[in-house]
C-alpha cells in the first residue's frame, strides 16, 4: 500500500494495485485524482514515502527509474517526452544512450516494435515539432517498446485523439498484450478504458475506490458519479 507526496501534499493514500502477466489494467479517474502520480511512483519518477513497489517479486521501491526500465518496465508519459528539435530516429537514439537496451532488445526490432505502429517508419526523419499529437503518442509508445519491456505504463494514451484514432490506439494496445506484455493504462475516459482493459481500478483523491470487472463499474452509480466529477 503506497503513500506518495508531491512536496508537502500527500497525493496517494494507501494505493494498492496489481497487474498480472499479459494483463491489461486501467486506472480510471478524473483529472487530479492521482493517476499520473501512481504511474510516476511505479516508474520511480516520484519517491514513495511509505509502502512498496514490487516487480516480478523484487522490491524496487528504491531502485532508480533507469534501472527499472532496464529491468523491463516501459513508460510512455502523458506529454510523450519527445525532443522537438530532434528527428524521431534521434529521439530513439537518445533513449538508447540513457537506457541501453537489453541484449536481445534490438533483435527483431522491426518485427516486434514497428508491427504495433508501422506508421512510425514513415516519419523517422521528421523532427518532433512537426509531429501531430497522435504521431507523438505513437513515437512515445514505440520508443518504450524498443527497450523490450515486460510491462508497459501508458499515461493518458488516448487523450486529445479523434475517435477513429482512439480505435487505432486501442488496437495497438491489444496487439501489445498479444505479445505477452502487460499494460497499465491511466485513463480519464471510462468508455475507452472498458474497451481495452481486463480489469479496472478507479481512483479519486488519491484513494482506490473501486476494483473489478470494467463492466461492473457502469452499474455502480456512486463510482460513476465520482469519476465524472
Q: Model regions: which residues?
A:
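The feature captures the beta-strand-to-loop junction immediately N-terminal to the Walker
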Residues: 28-30
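Catalytic Walker B motif of ABC-type/P-loop ATPase nucleotide-binding domains
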Residues: 152-156
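ABC ATPase C-loop
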Residues: 144-145
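Conserved ABC transporter NBD signature motif
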Residues: 51-59, 71, 105-110
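Conserved ABC ATPase signature
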Residues: 127-131
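Helix-to-loop junction immediately C-terminal to a conserved catalytic motif
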Residues: 43
Amino acid at each position: 500500500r503506497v503513500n506518495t507526496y508531491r512536496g508537502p501534499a500527500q497525493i496517494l493514500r494507501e494505493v494498492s494495485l496489481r497487474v498480472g502477466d499479459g494483463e491489461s489494467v486501467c486506472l480510471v479517474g478524473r483529472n487530479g485524482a492521482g493517476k499520473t502520480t501512481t504511474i510516476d511512483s511505479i516508474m520511480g519518477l516520484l519517491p514513495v514515502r511509505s509502502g512498496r513497489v514490487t516487480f516480478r517479486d523484487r522490491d524496487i521501491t528504491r531502485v532508480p527509474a533507469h534501472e527499472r526500465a532496464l529491468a523491463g518496465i516501459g513508460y510512455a508519459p502523458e506529454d510523450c517526452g519527445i525532443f522537438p528539435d530532434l528527428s524521431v530516429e534521434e529521439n530513439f537514439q537518445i533513449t538508447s544512450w540513457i537506457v541501453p537496451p537489453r541484449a536481445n532488445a534490438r533483435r527483431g526490432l522491426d518485427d516486434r516494435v514497428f508491427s504495433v505502429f508501422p506508421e512510425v517508419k514513415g516519419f523517422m526523419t521528421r523532427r518532433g515539432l512537426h509531429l501531430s499529437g497522435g504521431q507523438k503518442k505513437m513515437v512515445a509508445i514505440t520508443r518504450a517498446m524498443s527497450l523490450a519491456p515486460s510491462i508497459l505504463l501508458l499515461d493518458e494514451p488516448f487523450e486529445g485523439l479523434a475517435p477513429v484514432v482512439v480505435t487505432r490506439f486501442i488496437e495497438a494496445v491489444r496487439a501489445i498484450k498479444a505479445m505477452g506484455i502487460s499494460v497499465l493504462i491511466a485513463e480519464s475516459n471510462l468508455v475507452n478504458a472498458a474497451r481495452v482493459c481486463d480489469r479496472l481500478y478507479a481512483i479519486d483523491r488519491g484513494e482506490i475506490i473501486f476494483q473489478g470487472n470494467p463492466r461492473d463499474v457502469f452499474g455502480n452509480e456512486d463510482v460513476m458519479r465520482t469519476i465524472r466529477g
